[in-house]
């Protein structure tokens, strides 16, 4: 996490993990979730906070989750189901279930199918925000698998050279096991800056860096200044000169795999739920020797 996003020490309040855990679990159950689902949802938020991903942690997300519960955009007791499948792949209708709960469930389905077929691929439609993508991808590590997780973020990004919000933030994560080194985990949105970091910047009163956002007509803001109210987030890369077409195209790729593939539409024409997701699990020993793979990863790291 960049230093500008840290809460100033003079106003920071530190609490024991167990204390905050019980509080957040209590909020989730108050919203109607089962005890077990509340525990799972809290796990994802604490995982993010402990790794410095404050944009997807408790303080930045809980207010929004409560709002989404209250306005019906998150169903506290979903009856998610597999609506289409073929061997190693399937599509799940999340029934607007909380992504912090249905996300791990879907990733585990991908892992189960990878155990049987060598690879597992699961699309989720009619879903909601699933927190830090890295949490879901990392579930594959203990199974000697490579995990990928991606999701459709808010449609707040302009295409390269564009002046309208037509593209999702669309984060992607990959988790790769190693032998002795820490696992390789990459987790990032395909925008110049995560949307939740913009919300965090506005909450903390800190400036946006050059190339993060554009003004209302799509002109990139190339000086450090406060985030304007009518901002548009730029694709990863910021401007065409430094590669924003790559970030834009990666965001489109994730939109296709997560939303279009699960019959959820795309961009401003999405339908059903707050988000769609896609999860992949690769069983390493279906491709190569696991120990050799991990040794090679150690050397690479």
Predicted region positions:
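Phosphate/diphosphate-binding glycine-rich loops and adjacent basic-rich segments that engage nucleotide
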Residues: 157-228
């Amino acid at each position: 996490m960049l230093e500008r996003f840290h809460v100033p020490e003079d106003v920071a309040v530190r609490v024991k993990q167990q204390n905050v855990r019980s509080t957040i679990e209590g909020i989730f159950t108050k919203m109607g979730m089962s005890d077990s689902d509340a525990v799972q949802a809290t796990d994802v938020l604490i995982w993010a906070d402990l790794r410095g991903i404050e944009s997807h942690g408790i303080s930045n997300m809980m207010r929004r989750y409560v709002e989404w519960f209250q306005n019906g955009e998150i169903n506290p007791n979903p009856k998610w189901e597999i609506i289409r499948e073929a061997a190693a792949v399937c599509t799940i209708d999340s029934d607007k279930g909380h992504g912090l709960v249905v996300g791990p469930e879907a990733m585990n389905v991908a892992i189960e199918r990878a155990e049987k077929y060598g690879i597992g691929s699961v699309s989720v439609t009619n879903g909601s925000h699933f927190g830090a993508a890295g949490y879901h991808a990392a579930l594959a590590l203990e199974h000697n698998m490579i995990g990928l997780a991606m999701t459709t973020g808010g449609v707040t990004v302009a295409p390269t050279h564009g002046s309208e919000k037509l593209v999702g933030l669309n984060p992607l994560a990959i988790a790769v096991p190693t032998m002795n080194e820490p696992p390789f985990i990459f987790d990032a949105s395909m925008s110049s800056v995560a949307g939740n970091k913009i919300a965090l910047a506005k909450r903390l009163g800190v400036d946006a860096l050059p190339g993060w956002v554009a003004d209302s007509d799509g002109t990139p803001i190339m000086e450090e200044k406060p985030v304007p109210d009518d901002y548009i987030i730029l694709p990863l890369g910021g401007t065409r000169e430094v590669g924003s077409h790559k970030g834009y195209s990666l965001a489109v790729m994730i939109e296709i795999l997560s939303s279009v593939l699960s019959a959820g539409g795309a961009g401003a024409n999405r339908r059903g739920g707050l988000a769609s997701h896609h999860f992949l699990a690769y069983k390493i020993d279906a491709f190569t020797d696991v120990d050799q793979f991990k040794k090679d990863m150690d050397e690479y790291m």
